[in-house]
Curated annotation (Swiss-Prot):
SUPFAM superfamilies: Nucleotide-diphospho-sugar transferases (SSF53448)
Family to which this protein belongs: Belongs to the glycosyltransferase 2 family. OpgH subfamily.
InterPro entries (UniProt xref): Glucans_biosynth_gluTrFase_H (IPR023725), Glyco_trans_2-like (IPR001173), Glycosyltr_2/OpgH_subfam (IPR050321), Nucleotide-diphossugar_trans (IPR029044)
Pfam families, per database record: Glyco_trans_2_3
Organism from which the protein derives: Shewanella oneidensis (strain ATCC 700550 / JCM 31522 / CIP 106686 / LMG 19005 / NCIMB 14063 / MR-1)
Enzyme class: transferase
An annotated GO cellular component: plasma membrane
EC number in record: 2.4.1.-
Designated name of the protein: Glucans biosynthesis glucosyltransferase H
GO biological process: glucan biosynthetic process
Annotated region described as Disordered, given as residue ranges: 17-41
Amino acid sequence: MTVSESSVLDTEVLVGGSAMPNERPGPMEPQSLSQMPEGFPRRSTVANGVRSRASRRFFVVGGALLLSSFAIYEMGAVFSIGGITPLEYLMLALFAINFCWIALAFCSGIAGFLLLLKKPKPNELAQTELHTRTAILMPTYNESPDRVFSAVSVMAEALSQTGHGHAFDWFILSDTTDPEIALLEEQAFLVLRQETHKHSRVYYRRRRKNVARKAGNVADFCRRWGSRYDHLLVLDADSLMESSTITGLAQRMQADPDAGLIQTIPSLINGTTLMARLQQFAARIYGPVIGTGLGWWVQKEGNFWGHNAIIRTEAFMGAAGLPNLKGKPPFGGHILSHDFVEAALIRRAGWSVVIAYDLPGSYEECPPSIVDLAVRDRRWCQGNLQHSRILPTKGLHWVSRLHLMTGIMAYLSSPFWLLLILTGLMLALQAHFIRPEYFTDQFSLFPTWPIMDSDRALRLFYITMVVLFGPKIFGVLLLLKDGKFARSVGGRIKAMFSVLFEVILSALIAPIMMFIHCGAVMSILMGRDSGWSPQRRDDGSMPWLTLIYRHRWHMLAGVMLGYAAILDSLTLLAWMSPALIGLWLAVPISAWTGSIKIGEFFKRIGILATPEERNPAPICIRAQEARAAYQSHIEQPWTLAQLLKDPALMELHLAMVDKQPLRAAGTPIEPVEAIVHVKVHEAQCQQSALALFNRQEMALVLANPLMLRSLQKLPEQFVPEDLVSFC
């Protein structure tokens, strides 16, 4: 049977029809970064459809510039009494960079705080009939299939009950490379089809080669099936979204013909470890202040965070095709942090990009430990630093460039912070060990005293702390003001204990993350690529020896900084102790925060509680129940040997294999594919062939109907008289 013949079996073998709908190819060309494409920006459909208010930018960005200018002036005045030395100039420059970074967040937080004080109601549209079609995409890469497929199951069922289910199709787009997980995905898809085929259209496709990672996965869908749909609603493997949020996004997109992308602000859920619950609590208490403020002032020049957002297909395919950057990774090659770039390109083309800060019901999960956070941040750091190549792109809106710059600073701020600490330490040691030069070469009746304005320095320190902790303060004030919100996290007293605990623990973790980010930046500057590792999402625990190895340099750095401080004075050591204690205790902090047991203990006593944890949404409860059911459904995974032995099982598998041609005629064959061809051709039986395949080769075979048919023709085991002798 040929590949084309096997596809005919789809509708006969699979419940609910073929694994994927018929293709409707459409162009999605890589965009030029060096020149503005012809016809861009498009003319808005509605008058002022993509215009933003300058007054909001003046309030936030202008306020941040004014605040930064004042702080930089004050810092200069601290040093200027006795003349500014080169080391003090360096410290002033580093202070300016760091302060500008936190001032923007502070002013954005003020806007969010003032807006949330009014308790704004969601911008609800009339429940109009949806006449557009939306593809809901769930990309997955070596994730637990029970998590992914159960989430789609409950969301599809809930959406079908709204009366709008006909307007949506669901797609699980797999880039999985692990053959065992790939077969589990197929089993889970069969269960999903059984559950949903009467009320929803759910599809599954696994790519043979995961070119360009998640961005390439979504782009492959767009080029082959995107033209069938008006919108794409992109989720992540750990995403959940309430049906009202899904329909609300589609209705907003339908109502605004100039909208290119609408991004929700997801709430963090399902954290079991202390680290995950810490992130959940911080995001829930302080996150809305920043998110609301950001959405308010960026207006039509918002951003994309890669998931839990709806995108107009025309805008995405016509304007957001990503080019390959010249050179090799980490700065060249495929664009890793694709989301910021796609949002910038969509806005460049004349579509609006909006952050729907008023739309609830969007959820995601977070890394369970410091180590898992470091693994994720290493990849994000490389992608964000890669944006330095995107900043000069022709035609980008200045706010889009600011988003890119903010992403870069999210990781460069750590080296700048470390340099600021080291410079301050050197100034202290210089004052302690190096004798001042009281009389310079120029004639003077009075000596030059090495002095600073200590009162002004202390005042500036207090101002800096207020700016740094401002968003947290605003979040706490909103919590204390809103009795219902306070009760949802256990009451005001327990909430304040949680806030205090979060501040202390975050202060201990911050220097560890600073050195992790510094290490990531250094490795990228040294030319090391991050790779693409699957994420752990539940248990964050690791053996102590592994943690000692991972944090060895952090502990050593803490000891060296402490030694340098004590050379000056115990007072300096005391001032630096908030940062040093976290480094000294990096291993136990990493172990304890990654522990489910410790996370459950704090959950029992109500510390770091969130409304979503104490009173979870129905969709979250159903997802947990469905996941347990899926785990039981796929507890006996298929194997390639079983597929070869059972023709009916093989037909089921082939019905789910991607129907894209294996290889165009005349194109070079991949080395791994050539190796597999040789192994299959020379194998005496199925048993010997399976013993020769590694995991990569096994995954390739599973995606290749021709190789599977060749293996089927082989006998199951060796027959001694058929052995070939070589002499």
